[in-house]
Amino acid sequence: MKVILFANTDWYLYNFRRSLALALQAAGYEVLLLSPPGDYSARLLALGLRWQALQMDRRSVNPLREMVLLLRLVRLFRRERPVLVHNFTVKCAVYGSIAARIARVSARINAVDGLGYVFSSDDRKARLLRPLVRAMLRVALGGRGARLILQNPDDRISFENFGLATAGRVALIPGAGVDCSRFCPRERAATVDAPPTVLLAARLLWEKGLAEYVEAARILRSQGRKVRFLLAGNPDPGNPTAVPEATIRDWVAQGIIEWLGHVDDMATLYASMDIVVLPSFYREGLPTSLIEAAACGLPLITTDMPGCREVVRHEADGLLVPPRDSRALAEAIARLLDSTILRSRLGEAARTKVLAMFDERIVIKRTQEVYRELVPAD
């Protein structure tokens, strides 16, 4: 039984869905991974997975280019003849599902991690695109043999309000999960007089709260606190809310933050951190950086926003602050800096929660259950 996993980058497939692909393969499925080419396709192939390149521009709205993409998908699905296509992100859900319906693929699963720029932004381009994307999503997500996987209850309500979710066809599954054997608490070598370290790991978008993070760092430094503020991630020039690289380098030049760029081994990086923050005011699905940090037993600070509040319960396994409030963020960081007991308690609780809810084995099992609902085993 052949299934296709379709995503907009090979980076996504490798970092978030390789465990699912390997588990499906071990369970007897024939798995084909589909994405544009990138730096991670060789890694997928080295794992013994089958991967195929598909040329697509995840930011394009050119009608001719998009029609070519749709036709490529239809031809590929007709040639490969999968019984199920599993699409990730909004654009892949739209084109993958429409192509699958044309190619008469019997089952379609669309995993959408938040509503994305078109629905969350209020700029002119987003407002113009919204009716078209909504109409395309209605076509893509409808029909027999379709399931929608969402990551949090807020998104479910939003999809229902937009008329995009039908009762009985939505599954709530918490993201891709995390490998809790790899992301786990590690012993740290004691370093005399080493300043505590705070980390923000995210795509470098304004919506992720970068400006608030930098301002919180300024506030705490003005109080005479010796703290290292680290930023991990690369700029995303194609995104309308991307922070310019020149701005990031200016923050570094001012001595406010240290910019690490892309970090491949996040588990090792977390092992040297004291606090992890994500001051996002973006509608997250479920923030992977928070789940990974929680699995490592680190105390978390994030905002009271959809997706974020599913990972952190205030005072129980982390701290929540209002979005776009740099002073509240600074106060929460200061509170954790001043109490090793609180950091330890919240970190331990965060790890316990991840083991119970976000372990990738739980997520993979639930995903396979959705597969079996659509395509019962012979």
Short names for language-model regions:
Residues 299-302, 312:
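Short hydrophobic beta-strand element within catalytic cores of glycosyltransferases
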Residues 271-285, 298:
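Acidic donor-binding loop of glycosyltransferase active sites
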Residues 233, 242-263:
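Nucleotide-activated donor-binding/catalytic signature segment of Leloir-type glycosyltransferases, i.e.
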